[in-house]
């Protein structure tokens, strides 16, 4: 069996997330269907992340095992010609048998985009979160420092996960601002369920003055989900890169 690695870009607006479901359109399902059409093999692909409905990716990584004779770098074209317009294989290559898109990963970078103006945005609204009240970006930047490092992030996780540990290491968290566009970048060795979206919601709570920067330390130590911010909508979230 050969092991093929894919780098995938997708617009998650019209998907029910990455993971195959009995009902609903998923990224995993459309790619597996395209591979079946290209090779005649019913395979299961492993994704680096299980993104939720509405979340996008610039560089999702996946891998699958195949007996096909298609050269590794030619799978890109073979699959792309059978995919819908909102999913694209950016690169394909044959890798070692022990590579696994999820379990071999050392970390990921996500971005989240906020448009901070009173008027809602009509163009490109599916890729950002509209927040109409003024945000103090300098205070939000100060708050970023409290998240960096190895902590128990259970206060920033939505219920419904069965993971064994809620401790993660955030390597970097910073904010770029261009006019009324605020873009938050976060890199970590792993993420809890909705962790990025809740951290962004907490930064918004700092930015609108409803939470003090110094309270972040207490929220992390107490692990109290109710004291953290809201879970912002998925559409502003993009998986930017996966590290190996």
Swiss-Prot record:
InterPro entries: PsdUridine_synth_cat_dom_sf (IPR020103), PsdUridine_synth_TruA (IPR001406), PsdUridine_synth_TruA_a/b_dom (IPR020097), PsdUridine_synth_TruA_C (IPR020095), TruA/RsuA/RluB/E/F_N (IPR020094)
EC number(s) given by UniProt: 5.4.99.12
Binding site for substrate: 110
Pfam annotation, one family: PseudoU_synth_1
UniProt keyword list: Isomerase, tRNA processing
GO molecular function list: RNA binding; tRNA pseudouridine(38-40) synthase activity
Domain of life: Bacteria
CDD domains: PseudoU_synth_EcTruA (cd02570)
Catalytic activity: uridine(38/39/40) in tRNA = pseudouridine(38/39/40) in tRNA
GO biological process: tRNA pseudouridine synthesis
Active-site residues, record numbering mapped to chain: 52 (nucleophile)
Subunit record text: Homodimer.
Membership in a protein family: Belongs to the tRNA pseudouridine synthase TruA family.
Known role: Formation of pseudouridine at positions 38, 39 and 40 in the anticodon stem and loop of transfer RNAs.
Name the record gives this protein: tRNA pseudouridine synthase A
UniProt source species: Clostridium beijerinckii (strain ATCC 51743 / NCIMB 8052) (Clostridium acetobutylicum)
């Amino acid at each position: 069996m050969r092991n093929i690695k894919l780098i995938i870009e997708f617009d998650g607006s019209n998907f029910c997330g990455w993971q195959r479901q009995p009902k609903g359109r998923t990224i995993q399902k459309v790619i597996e269907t395209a591979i079946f059409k290209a090779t005649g093999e019913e395979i299961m692909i492993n994704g680096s992340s299980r993104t939720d409905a509405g979340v996008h990716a610039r560089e999702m990584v996946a891998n699958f095992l195949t007996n096909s004779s298609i050269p590794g770098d030619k799978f890109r074209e073979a699959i792309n010609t059978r995919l819908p317009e909102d999913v694209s294989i950016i690169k394909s290559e044959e890798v070692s048998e022990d590579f696994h898109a999820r379990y071999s990963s050392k970390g990921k970078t996500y971005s989240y985009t906020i448009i901070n103006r009173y008027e809602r945005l009509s163009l490109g609204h599916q890729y950002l979160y509209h927040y109409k009240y003024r945000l103090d970006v300098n205070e939000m930047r100060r708050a970023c420092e409290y998240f960096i490092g190895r902590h128990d992030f259970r206060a920033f996780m939505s219920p419904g996960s069965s993971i064994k540990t809620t401790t993660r290491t955030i390597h970097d968290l910073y904010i770029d601002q261009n006019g009324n566009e605020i873009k938050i970048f976060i890199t970590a060795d792993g993420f809890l369920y909705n962790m990025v979206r809740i951290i962004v919601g907490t930064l918004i709570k700092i930015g609108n003055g409803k939470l003090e920067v110094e309270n972040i330390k207490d929220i992390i130590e107490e692990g109290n989900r109710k004291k953290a911010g809201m879970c912002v909508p998925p559409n502003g979230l993009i998986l930017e890169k996966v590290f190996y």
